[in-house]
Amino acid sequence: MLRPPPPSSVLTASAAAARPPASVVQPQRQAAHRRRAETLRLRRVFEMFDRDGDGVITPAELSGALCRLGARGEAPPAAAALDAVVAAYIAPGMAGLRFAEFEALHAELAGLGGRQAVAAAEAEEEKEADMREAFGVFDEDGDGYISAAELQAVLSRMGLPEAACMARVRDMIAAADRDSDGRVDYEEFKAMMAAGN
């Protein structure tokens, strides 16, 4: 006659059957450990960037941290692209990024969004290079300014009637000349071109 197994062995056998094999559990534990370690690392970075310790990284604090790390200041178009990405993560009514937003921003920059941010920065750099090249066409002597005489010469080569009247050329310079020095520097040229688009 067969005897039924003792109740404790039935429970042990059913618990063992319900438990996933070690080959599944171990990678899950490792992944959870990596996530915790990454969160702790990000928390340390967040606290390092949050200079005043208020739990929010302002754009100024982020910019300062990136400067200290040597990742800011060399490519203004890339910096502008980064500023736009960061601004998208700042919650309405907040002065900066809280840890959860910082973590989400990090995830985007590390994943597909990071490649998109890089592509956007590269496109912005290309646009900047094109703008500098256009400025160079007008800045014939390369001194960093477009004078009325330089503008008149370029307009004349282009066959535009405005070149015939120096007063009209000076008016064109004055319209773009924000600091009233009688010539157009690169930033003024850029602002004029942006206003025209």
Swiss-Prot record:
The keyword Metal-binding applies. It comes from Oryza sativa subsp. japonica. This is Probable calcium-binding protein CML21. SMART domains: EFh. Keywords: Calcium, Metal-binding, Repeat. Ca(2+) 2 binds at residues 139, 141, 143, 145, 150. Residues 1-33 are annotated as: Disordered. Pfam families: EF-hand_6 (PF13405), EF-hand_7 (PF13499). It comes from the Eukaryota. Residues 9-30 have a biased composition (Low complexity). Ca(2+) 3 binds at residues 177, 179, 181, 183, 188. Residues 37-72, 126-161, 164-197 form the EF-hand domain.
